[in-house]
Amino acid sequence: MIMGIGTDILEISRVIQYIDDNKFLTRILHPDERERFDTFQSEKRKAEYLAGRFCVKEAYAKALGTGIGKLSFQDICCLNDVSGKPYIKDDTNAHVSIAHTDTIATAYVIVTDGNVIL
């Protein structure tokens, strides 16, 4: 059963100025996300990744009904499985989708109770 749905959208240009700001990156990205972020060479890819992860965290907090006020960005870690599918670390009941264009990143998160309804 669906317990909550959250979505977020962000202009990538709003985060590009922060891709070299260690203080901002440390506040937003979980260490596991930061490790992946640091592998990217291009500013464009770094900005896409940062905007996407920011959107996931906002969408996840909305889906839980808490907002970021009850969770910190560090409490939420979005990784990718071997096929590239994004997931929230330590929450198998969260289902994540991230997309971006050249200018916009968006994320959609559904949180379920773990029961499958056919």
Swiss-Prot record:
Keyword Transmembrane helix recorded: no
A Pfam family per the record: ACPS
InterPro entries xrefs: 4-PPantetheinyl_Trfase_dom, 4-PPantetheinyl_Trfase_dom_sf, ACPS, Ppantetheine-prot_Trfase_dom
GO CC annotation terms, alphabetical: cytoplasm
Entry's EC annotation: 2.7.8.7
Subcellular location, record wording: Cytoplasm
Cofactors that this protein relies on: Mg(2+)
Keywords: Cytoplasm, Fatty acid biosynthesis, Fatty acid metabolism, Lipid biosynthesis, Lipid metabolism, Magnesium, Metal-binding, Transferase
Enzyme class: transferase
Reaction(s) catalysed (UniProt annotation): apo-[ACP] + CoA = holo-[ACP] + adenosine 3',5'-bisphosphate + H(+)
MF term (GO), any: holo-[acyl-carrier-protein] synthase activity
Main location: cytoplasm
GO biological process: fatty acid biosynthetic process
Residues reported to bind Mg(2+): D8, E58
Family label: Belongs to the P-Pant transferase superfamily. AcpS family.
Function: Transfers the 4'-phosphopantetheine moiety from coenzyme A to a Ser of acyl-carrier-protein.
Protein name: Holo-[acyl-carrier-protein] synthase
Organism of origin: Macrococcus caseolyticus (strain JCSC5402) (Macrococcoides caseolyticum)
